[in-house]
Amino acid sequence: MAKVAKDLNPGVQKMSLGQQQSARGVACLRCKGMCSGFEPHSWRKICKSCKCSQEEHCLSSDLDDDRKIGRLLMDSKYATLTARVKGGDGIRIYKRNRMIMTNPIATGKDPTFDTITYEWAPPGVTQKLGLQYMELIPKERQPVTGTEGALYRRRQLMHQLPIYDQDPSRCRGLVENELKAMEEFVKHYKSEALGVGEVALPGQGGLPKEENKTQEKPEGTETTAPTTNGSLGDPSKEVEYVCELCKGAAPVDSPVVYADRAGYSKQWHPTCFQCIKCSEPLVDLIYFWKDGAPWCGRHYCESVRPRCSGCDEIIFSEDYQRVEDLAWHRKHFICEGCEQLLSGRAYIVTKGQLLCPTCSKSKRS
């Protein structure tokens, strides 16, 4: 039976903003034994030891992730997917749906059981539909506890939904006007772009929660009826549902994903519900709707405001350094090798790396 995780004990809810410090020594998933363990950089979102990103060290925990998603969804129409933390001063936590499958194994007289726990499953679905959905996801990406799929999900939560894209307290050095700009930025995307995909059988998107409401189409998107074996509007022929991305058929007995901001005439195969920019599956079905397509949080934010290539945070100042399609806070226009400020000095940008001439030459040799 599917279960919902509700770790709401206030005694374990207190998170430290110095999480990086407490995560010292965590092994790097990319470097394996070559990295001595996570050593936080003072302002870059990387390990000083191996130069890999924070997400390669999987610094977050289930509780960290649930609080982050809870904060993201609060004050939006998806707040029903969150729960208030008792004594938490208005803090909300994600009601993450976990699915536990227990299968008996016939081995002699005493029965044993094989238990599989999915660390996340689509919300609001039956166990049967949830399992059908999981079977359509590549095995290496299924979020089963203790597997590469579970690690993949956690890394994607960090990459696609950075905490510093929604929480000003996780950003470094925002001045008053930048803080106000960020608050308006977050408020706007929660109201106009943020969404959570819904898993249902073709033709059943929006039901029963929306069955008594008129489905509204977001401005700028088109609503088209499902194709009917090549002939629109013929009631004598069976309805054929088509995936919005690959244009392949969606069998009526196989789950698809709906995005309410797209309208319920559109559906995606589970593996096709991905960011239009990076083509990565949208983690936990969380999307941002823009220009008629779903985006991950990271790339949606970057499409609206520039992101600093140094600290990885969104830039809310109008005074920043830009080189081609890359941007930096003025104070972060710094060589990635020797850490000297490069404003007004010679520099070289190679494969996204900002280097002074000396470090660039050393790197090539």
UniProtKB/Swiss-Prot annotation:
Domain LIM zinc-binding: 241-306, 307-365
Phenotype caused by lack of the gene: Mice display a marked increase in cardiac hypertrophy.
Tissue expression profile of the protein: Expressed in distal airway epithelium of the lung, vascular smooth muscle, and myocardium.
Source organism, top-level taxon: Eukaryota
Gene Ontology MF terms: transcription corepressor activity; zinc ion binding
Polar residues bias: start-end ranges: 221-231
Family annotation (InterPro entries): PET_domain, PET_testin, Pk/Esn/Tes, Znf_LIM
Transmembrane segment boundaries: none
Domain PET: 99-206
Compartment(s): Cytoplasm; Nucleus
GO CC aspect terms: cytoplasm; nucleus
A Gene Ontology biological process term: positive regulation of calcineurin-NFAT signaling cascade
Free-text note regarding domains: The LIM zinc-binding domains and the Cys-rich region mediate interaction with GATA6.
Function: Transcriptional cofactor that restricts GATA6 function by inhibiting DNA-binding, resulting in repression of GATA6 transcriptional activation of downstream target genes. Represses GATA6-mediated trans activation of lung- and cardiac tissue-specific promoters. Inhibits DNA-binding by GATA4 and GATA1 to the cTNC promoter. Plays a critical role in the development of cardiac hypertrophy via activation of calcineurin/nuclear factor of activated T-cells signaling pathway.
Subunit structure and binding partners: Interacts with beta-dystroglycan. Interacts with GATA1, GATA4 and GATA6.
Identification of the protein by name: LIM and cysteine-rich domains protein 1
Lineage of the species this protein comes from: Eukaryota, Metazoa, Chordata, Craniata, Vertebrata
